[in-house]
Amino acid sequence: EVGTMDERTVITIGREFGSGGHEIGMKLAEKLGIKCYDKELLELAAKESGLCEELFASQDEKPTNSFLYSLVMDTYSLGYTNSYVDMPINHKVFLAQFDAIKKLAERESCVIVGRCADYALEDNPYAVSVFIKASLDERVQRIKRIYELNDSKAADLIQKTDKRRASYYNYYSSKKWGEAKSYN
């Protein structure tokens, strides 16, 4: 069990698709007696922001190819627009998740899988960030088993999912997805 709020532990997990990162997060949380958030985080963010959950599901770890997040944030923080209402929907989704991650980390010990959580919590003294990797062969075998695919389709799904995750992470954070220096 994790101790009092003064001893709070927040572990963020980035992961390659098929590496078992989500499963590792769940087992780690169970062992520590804390919650693991992944898709649940989307629901929490949706409820707190008032945006519907279906909208969040469609934006789940998918980047946009429009202007950079930092530019958007500068524009909104400097007041060049009327309000949050004018913001593109994908940015609303990202900001709601970002906010939910920060609130969770302030409130409780937990494990958070994906969602640029390490970036959201980079200034949080209780947060530790890890990235889970596995060999391509191990990942293909795992994805084949889970999704009942052949080698080729499993490898294709891995490549597409990793590319999507990297694009999302690199787009919304100032770091590079999967690069050791981006994590603890």
Which positions does each model-derived feature cover?
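Small-molecule kinase domains that catalyze NTP-dependent phosphoryl transfer to phosphate-bearing small molecules
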Residues: S66-L71, N150-N184
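Conserved phosphate-donor/acceptor-positioning beta-strand/loop module used by diverse small-molecule
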Residues: D123-I146, D151-Q159
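ATP-dependent small-molecule kinase phosphotransfer cores
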Residues: A46-S109
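Short beta-strand-centered segment that lines the nucleotide-binding/catalytic pocket of NTP-utilizing
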Residues: K35-K47
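Pre-Walker A (Motif I) flank of P-loop NTPase domains
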Residues: E7-E16, E108
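Short, polar loop motifs at secondary-structure junctions
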Residues: G114-D118
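Short, Lys/Arg-enriched N-terminal segments with co-localized hydrophobic residues
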Residues: E1-M5
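Glycine-rich phosphate-binding P-loop
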Residues: I13-L28
